[in-house]
Amino acid sequence: MATGSWPTIVDVATRTDPEGNIAEVAEMLSQCNDYEGDAPYIEANEKTGHEFSFRTSIPAGSWRSYNMGVGYSKSTTGKSRVGIGMLEDWSQVDRALLRHSGQGEKFRRSEDFAFLEGMSQTIAQTLIYGNTAITPAEFMGLAPFYNSLTAAQNGANIIDCGGTGSSNTSIWYIGWSPESFFLVYPRGTTAGIHMEDRGDTVPAFDNLGNPYLAFTSVFEQHVGLCPKDWRYGARMANLDVTNAGLAGPNAYDLFAGMAETVLHFPKTTKAVSGVEKTDAPNDQFGTRRIWYCNRTV
């Protein structure tokens, strides 16, 4: 996997917390889902979202002969905005249970890690399927941006794998960089998941509404996805997992489809004899290109 020069969640957390507390949490989070080590985190220009500009056309130039002028031309740009979602959860452990466990904070941290992993999986799922039209509080994921083969310009980056049944899935190919696809966090804050230890000052409640003393950890992450340049995202859609990669007249050639998908990106990083070198020294000028698929594929 390419390393690039832009900060990931662990890098940002390390720089913003001299004590290392957030960094430790971020390191744990990066072990839960690979995307945490793939995506650059950029500070948004708003508290609740990020407005960005993108190019809609470029000058083509003019062929000219002697004594012939050249017409004026210019590029054109557009603006768009993505929202930032707020994900939060509370871990509460009965104070008496913690004392009687014989492991104290070690027992509590093992419970906290389960919450970290759960939140990480929620963000990973939202990264693909998030749709504010269905759940307004979350952020918009990849699927709504690449949901039609013909309705939008970015439909050109959707490869139809031909599946028509109920066992279809998608494979995603994303080029991460600060100029293509990146994650954003609110202006004036720090990236990644934040953990607040509230001690035993916050009461917990049983099913009958009765309070009891509990040690409480509050976890929250504010994050959004910015598809600044849609050309660096591609989707292999309608992939029937029952015959992908199998031989036979009806089988889909998975590797041929992946090769076709790679060709949709406008440019790549340093290459030798047409083969990409993901560890190339100048990789910071390109994108960190990653495949995402489920375990079945």
Which residue stretches match the model-derived regions?
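Core alpha/beta structural scaffold of self-assembling particle/tube/pore-forming proteins
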Residues: 2-37, 49-53, 63, 73-297
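Short secondary-structure boundary/capping segments within folded domains
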Residues: 40-44
